Amino acid sequence: MNMPQSLGTQPLPPEPPSLGTPIEGSGAIAPTEHCWPVRPTLRNELDTFSVHFYIFFGPSVALPPERPAVFALRLLPVLDSGGVLSLELQLNASSLRQENVTVFGCLTHEVPLSLGDAAVTCSKESLAGFLLSVSATSRVARLRIPFPQTGTWFLTLRSLCGVGPRFVRCRNATAEVRLRTFLSPCVDDCGPYGQCKLLRTHNYLYAACECKAGWRGWGCTDSADALTYGFQLLSTLLLCLSNLMFLPPVVLAIRSRYVLEAAVYTFTMFFSTFYHACDQPGIVVFCIMDYDVLQFCDFLGSLMSVWVTVIAMARLQPVIKQVLYLLGAMLLSMALQLDRHGLWNLLGPSLFALGILATAWTVRSVRRRHCYPPTWRRWLFYLCPGSLIAGSAVLLYAFVETRDNYFYIHSIWHMLIAGSVGFLLPPRAKTDRRVPSGARARGCGYQLCINEQEELGLVGPGGTTVSSICVS
């Protein structure tokens, strides 16, 4: 992992205007009969794995024909080994004076190598480096070395005339090149299909690209397995439009006088739609606000939708129900700040709400000495289908959904959860406000009153009205 590797020919980021402290060249001598002066460089540290190197009186370098130019780049241990060393050569064609000049560059570690007058190589015995060349036909050459070895790197530049594979020393032609060298965390900041992340393995700190949408490579530039634009658009639309399944539950909740529940469903539908529009990899992305805010609101809305639906099914007293709604919102917000992607963030509140529901129904069944809700139609056509749909959605979310099938499994999850709400949300209590004449004529005495709507599971135990059927 610490061995040098070259890759890519992408444009490099601009240079900063400020300079840092100079680095002294090591003065290493190549295994030849010549000694070359090594030109020092300036080091400007900007951030983690972000260093720019400059030469004195640069960035343009004049290369006389009689000798090469050698530059030393010092990479510090730990601080520089986890990034990408980038180098760019650009030939100034106006300085050639119609000479057929080619400028060669040889980048080696610890020991500079000589570039001969005829055969141009960048290796000798057990030492090998990276060779670059620029000419009138190819004026720009780029080199990138991820995770470079620390120590001193030597760049040797030499101008030769003629046409390959054999060259000769130029007689009276001074070439001018522009040299740029810097260290960056990732290759081109990973481009539009990746994200540069700072990672740590044991005590080793390094930066790497996390590619999306099937893109691969050091800089997320390998499109061999990349998703097409049409596929990205399809997945985005499917994830966003599947949230429209919350419209029927919103309408049903409003018709049933569950205004607070309808507001929660609307909140969930809105933020889930725009969160998935912002969460997509690649170029099919639309963000109306910060990604972290959208993610938090989407997760909170999803959990609150489950919470308010189950609490509404318990048919508690209004004060108790409002307290549980507020308490659930605060506890769910805290849980999401701790871990947004934990499975228990979904199962925990759901199981707790189901416990409240089971307790309320059990107490009501014991008091009335029959099952609650009492009608088999409510169980057969609403509760059982709704529970089956909601359980299927949880199983898909917990055990089936992966990164590869996310876009359609999660879309199904949206539709199943929204569909289950339409079955599980209890209906509105229909009470008759007309007062019978006999109700006012009765005096004191004991009466056993049975509210038909309450027995059908349509009103709470505190909802008895004067329209109840009373038996002395």
Curated annotation (Swiss-Prot):
Residues 255-257, 314-315, 364-379, 427-472 are cytoplasmic. One of its GO terms (cellular component) is mitochondrion. The keyword Mitochondrion applies. Keywords: Cell adhesion, Cell membrane, Cytoplasm, Disulfide bond, EGF-like domain, Endoplasmic reticulum, Glycoprotein, Growth regulation, Membrane, Mitochondrion, Nucleus, Transmembrane, Transmembrane helix. It comes from the Eukaryota. Glycans are attached at residue 100. Residues 1-24 are annotated as: Disordered. One of its GO terms (biological process) is cell adhesion. Signal peptide: none annotated. N-glycosylated. It is a multi-pass membrane protein. Residues 1-10 have a biased composition (Low complexity). The chain crosses the membrane at residues 234-254, 258-277, 293-313, 316-336, 343-363, 380-400, 406-426. Residues 182-221 form the EGF-like domain. It is found in: Cell membrane; Cytoplasm; Nucleus; Mitochondrion. Disulfide bonds join 186-196, 190-209, 211-220. Residues 1-233, 278-292, 337-342, 401-405 are extracellular. PROSITE patterns: EGF_1, EGF_2. Belongs to the TMEM8 family. May function as a regulator of the EGFR pathway. Probable tumor suppressor which may function in cell growth, proliferation and adhesion. May interact with EZR. This is Transmembrane protein 8B.
